[in-house]
Structure formats: structure tokens, C-alpha cells
Regions:
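Thiol/selenol-based redox catalytic cores and closely related redox-interacting motifs
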Residues: 95-97, 101-181
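Non-catalytic, surface beta->alpha helical segment in thiol-disulfide oxidoreductase systems
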Residues: 174-194
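Thiol-based oxidoreductase modules, predominantly thioredoxin-like and allied folds used
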Residues: 67-88, 103-114
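Conserved helix-turn-beta segment immediately C-terminal to the redox Cys motif
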Residues: 39-40, 48-49, 53-77, 96-100
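A short beta-strand-turn-helix
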Residues: 21-40, 61-66
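Short, Lys/Arg-enriched N-terminal segments with co-localized hydrophobic residues
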Residues: 4-14
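Short loop/turn microsegments at loop-to-beta-strand junctions
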Residues: 18-19, 41, 161-163
Length: 194
């Protein structure tokens, strides 16, 4: 079941920062990203039945280690890549908590690419387009992934589950990490932003 996405009054390209967006938590509560000003954000598109799902362990380790210093981790479940997150919002959140001890915020399931892509991910893709993936330039990676996922259309599109975005305290710096990048591999970037 596709979650309702919130509509912002402005188009994505007119948005100034990540703080102009809102999204729904898995319990249906509206989360206003303006509340995260002054925090370092780690936003991840997740899936519970993916080969990268064990990354929840590393993501939770970062969450536990740095949350008191200002890191906020937010997982957005997505079922666009080989339907690897088919459960309901409640089932997905329960899976994350029971199997990986996840304590960070899990949102309602969304699309990250295509006409129904959540505005937050449209903004993130615009601000931090992928330069390469698996050694391929973004255009080549998009062509490769289009063969396994119909949601990959543009070079900036999310290529797979567990693409990660790290956003600085003032929202002006956004770094993008490929699904193959383990959480421990960008810990230094988190420390630098904190």
C-alpha cells in the first residue's frame, strides 16, 4: 500500500533547504523537518528484504553513538526495487526494531523515483546527484539499473535500496552514499559535520 505523500506549497526546485519539507512517520504522525535545524541528518531509503538490509546494524550503531551529539537518522522504506519492502508500515517498523534493534525514526513507505517520488527525495537527488555507482558514471549506472528496476529513469535517480544522504547542521552540505557504502565507511564524514 502506497503511503500518502504530503504536498508542499512550493515545487521542489524552489525549495531552499531540507527544512521546508514534511513527511509522515510510520505511525501516521507528521514530521516537520524544520524541527531538525541544527542537527546532522542521515536519511536512508530502506528495505526489509534486501541484500543490504543488514546495514541496519551499522546504521543503528551510528545512531546510538552520535545521537547525543546531534545526529538524527531517518529511514524511509521503499518498495520500488524488486518489491523488497512489501509489508505494511507497522510490519516494516516492527521488523526493523525486532531484528536489528532500530531505535531511529522509520517513516511511512514512499517512492523515491518517478512521478510519485516523495518531495524530500526529489530535493535530495537534485542537491546531491549520483556521480558514479559501482565504478560506472551516473548515466551508465542509470542504464544498468533500468534493466532491473523500472523506477530508474535519470542519472540522479536512486539506484537501489540503502542509498544514504548525510546533511550538515545548517542544511547547506549534502553528501550522497551508494547502497554498497557501509555505514562505518562514512563515519568520519559524520564526525566532521558534528
Amino acid at each position: 500500500m502506497q503511503a500518502r505523500r504530503l504536498r508542499n506549497p512550493k515545487k521542489t526546485i524552489d525549495m531552499a533547504t531540507i527544512y521546508d519539507y514534511k513527511a509522515l512517520a510510520s505511525n501516521g504522525k507528521e514530521i516537520d523537518f524544520a524541527d531538525f535545524k541544527g542537527k546532522v541528518l542521515l536519511i536512508i531509503n530502506t528495505a526489509s528484504k534486501c541484500g543490504f538490509t543488514p546495514q541496519f546494524d551499522g546504521l543503528e550503531a551510528l545512531n546510538e553513538k552520535y545521537r547525543d551529539r546531534g545526529l538524527v537518522c531517518i529511514g524511509f522504506p521503499c518498495n520500488q526495487f524488486k518489491e523488497q519492502d512489501p509489508g505494511s508500515d507497522g510490519e516494516i517498523e516492527e521488523f526493523c526494531r525486532l531484528n536489528y534493534g532500530v531505535t531511529f525514526q522509520i517513516m511511512k513507505k514512499i517512492d523515491v523515483n518517478g512521478p510519485e517520488a516523495h518531495p524530500i527525495f526529489e530535493y535530495l537527488k537534485q542537491q546531491a546527484p549520483a556521480e558514479e555507482y559501482l565504478g560506472l558514471k551516473a548515466k551508465g549506472a542509470a542504464a544498468l539499473f533500468k534493466t532491473i528496476s523500472t523506477s530508474v529513469e535519470k542519472p540522479s535517480d536512486i539506484k537501489w535500496n540503502f542509498t544514504k544522504f548525510l546533511i550538515s547542521r545548517d542544511g547547506t552540505e549534502i553528501k550522497r552514499y551508494a547502497p554498497t557504502t557501509e555505514p562505518k565507511d562514512f563515519e568520519k564524514d559524520i564526525e566532521a559535520m558534528l
